């Protein structure tokens, strides 16, 4: 029954998304992006914490329910595993995007290109150095970019079992990415406050 419901829900979502034009720029909307990768990590380990940090407290129960159903369905065979994983990732990204006040148009496949500033911001976070973004962000925005970058790095090494600490990191992480992409609003305005606390 669980698998049937998951397949029906997934096919319904897929049909709706096929009617929309694909976009190839949103960081958290790609299978290679951090949101989807954390979702897969949660499914592989059976620990929901990596995925939960991308959604606010108000949406936690919804994601936990989807997570438990996906875990159960994955044990029913290879085909069920693939459908369940995709269904969970679709829901994770959808809920995350809604928390940002952003539209959801599906999860883009592996290999989908992203904005060069997004790729550079990823490299900066990974290396702990803003050098990859040099020349991509206007000089008059550099000081604020440095501030947001420092805030993200300060919260990067958190206890991965602490969902609240993970959310605090994601708030600074996405704020940095949004600014690197040229957007001025704080991530928290759309994500943290929308969920009474806080999670590309």
Predicted regions and their residues:
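C-terminal segment of classical bacterial N-terminal signal peptides
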Residues: 12-23
């Amino acid at each position: 029954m669980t698998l049937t419901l998951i397949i029906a829900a997934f096919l319904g979502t897929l049909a709706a998304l096929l009617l929309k034009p694909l976009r190839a720029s949103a960081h958290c909307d790609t299978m290679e992006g951090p949101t989807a990768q954390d979702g897969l990590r949660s499914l592989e380990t059976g620990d929901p914490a990596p995925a939960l940090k991308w959604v606010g407290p108000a949406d936690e129960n919804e994601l936990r329910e989807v997570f438990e159903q996906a875990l159960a369905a994955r044990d029913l065979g290879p085909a069920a595993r693939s459908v369940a994983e995709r269904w969970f990732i679709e829901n994770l990204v959808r809920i995350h995007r809604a928390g940002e006040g952003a539209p959801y148009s599906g999860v883009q496949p592996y290999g989908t290109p992203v904005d060069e500033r997004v790729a550079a911001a990823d490299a900066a976070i990974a290396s702990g150095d803003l050098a990859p973004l040099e020349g991509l962000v206007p000089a008059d925005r550099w000081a604020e970019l440095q501030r947001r970058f420092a805030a993200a790095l300060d919260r990067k090494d958190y206890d991965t079992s602490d969902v609240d600490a993970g959310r605090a990191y994601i708030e600074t992480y996405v704020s940095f990415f949004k600014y690197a992409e040229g957007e001025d609003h704080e991530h928290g305005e759309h994500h943290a406050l929308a969920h009474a606390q806080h999670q590309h």
